Amino acid sequence: MKFNNLKISLELLFLYAQIKVKLTHLKHYSTRCSTLSLITVFPLDLLNYLSLIIIDVYYEICINYPNNFWLDSTSFDSRFLFILQNIEKKILRHNNYELLTKSINFKNYNLFLSSANLITHEDEKLFIWFFHILSEILIHKHKSSTISVKLLSIVGVHLIVKTLLIFLLLINNQSVVNSIFLSDSKIYHPQFINFNFWWQNLNQLVLRRIYSLYPIYVIKNNVLTTNYVFLPYFNSYLLQSNLTTWFSKLLK
C-alpha cells in the first residue's frame, strides 16, 4: 500500500477519530439534541494525551525488550496485560498532558508518523504484535486492570480507528499484512490472507463488536440518533485503497 501524502492521510485520520469519539461520548450527556453544541464537551487534548501514551509505551517496549518477548511462547494474555500495565504506569507517572509531553521521546514519535520508508522490518514485526494487543485492549477491556472502564473506553473508540489505520498506512508490503493472520491472535483467522477479503470481514471481526458497545451517534434531521452506517462505508471506500478520499468524504 502506497499513499501519495501520508501526512495528510494521518491528519485526516486523527481528525476523524476525534470527531467520532466526541460524538460517541455525547451519550453520557444526552440521548437527543437539536444542535452540535454538545460536541465540545470532550477535550481534544485528552485524545492527544492518550495517543502519546500509547505510542511512547510502544517504543519503550521495543527498545527495552527483545523480539522474543513478542514472538515466543509467552501467552497472549500475558503480553496484553503487560502492555496494559505499562500504559497505566505511564498515565499515573505523568498525570497531566504537559508532564507527559515533556517525557515523550519525540524522535521516536516523529519517526512513527513519518514516511513508511523509515519503518524497518523489525518495526513492522513488533508493530504487528502491538496492533494485536491493542485490539485486545479495545475489545475485551481487561478486567484485572485498575484503569477505569471509562478511560479505557475512550482509548478504545479512539484507537480502534487510529491505530488500525496508521498501521496500514505504514505498511507497503502485502506479505506483512498477510502475516497478521498467521499469529496466535484470538481475533483473526488464518484464512483471511486475501487483502480485499480481509477488508470485507473486518467489520464483522472487529468494528461491529466495538460499535455494539459504543454506538455511533450522528445528527440526522436535527436529532441525535444511533447509526451504524459507518460499517458499509468501511467496505465501499477502503476497498478502493484510498484512505484520503474515504476520510474526505466522511468528513464533509
Curated annotation (Swiss-Prot):
- Species of origin reads Guillardia theta
Can you name a GO cellular component term? chloroplast
Main localization (coarse): plastid
This chain belongs to the protein called: Uncharacterized 30.1 kDa protein
Top-rank taxon: Eukaryota
The places in or outside the cell where this protein is found are: Plastid, Chloroplast
Q: Which UniProt keywords apply?
A: Chloroplast, Plastid
